[in-house]
Amino acid sequence: MKKVHLKIDGKEVKAEEGMTILEAARSVGIDIPTLCYHEKLAPYGACRLCTVEIDKNGKTKLVTSCVYNVEDGLTVKTKSPKVERIRKMLLELMLASAPVLSERAGEYGIEKPRFESDLTQCILCGLCVRYCAEVKGANALTFVGRGKNRRVAFVDEVVNTGVCMDCRECFNVCPTGKIPRETDGASFEGITVQDVLAKAGSK
């Protein structure tokens, strides 16, 4: 496999061609925060928390490191002032929906989110949807609605026909950590993940 030479946070890195910046960074112990990334799934780039700043031929720009492949001569900054500002803003937005992110938010000096709280706590990262489709092959979850009405919903046709194995693994990958592992055998027909979260939050 051809090797690609780049620099990440001042460190010379040799990475395999086809690797993403995120993979290359982690291979040498450089931490880039993520929420929607999962090693079993294809890169998605939804949460944007893994944004980094790259310098390519003297031109700088921000890219999502989980979907951007390494290139020869690339210079990457994972903690530039611009990157830190963006991560802080993203975390504040997500913290309003998922208080469990408070530990990561604390790293960026966020004590209290500026944004209105959404008690459903779903951050729409898509991990549960993608895990169900790519790993389990069930496609029992999907996105519905647009904009502020966007939600993750169970697909009735799949749930009702038994294609959904009721494995609850989609709950386990949720980065908010707020979906209950046990739901008392409740049916998921006609409800959304947000409904499950809201019910759990009311207990």
Which residue ranges define each predicted feature?
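Flexible, acidic/Gly-rich N-terminal and inter-domain linker regions that tether
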Residues: 7, 28-32, 69-71, 87
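A generic secondary-structure micro-motif detector
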Residues: 11-12, 160
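N-terminal cofactor/phosphate-binding cores enriched in small/glycine residues
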Residues: 13-62, 85
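Aromatic-flanked redox-active Cys/Sec active sites in thiol-based oxidoreductases
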Residues: 10, 38, 119
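Eukaryote-biased recognition of intrinsically disordered, low-complexity regulatory segments
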Residues: 1-11
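Fe-S ferredoxin-like electron-transfer domains
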Residues: 48, 52, 58-172, 177-203
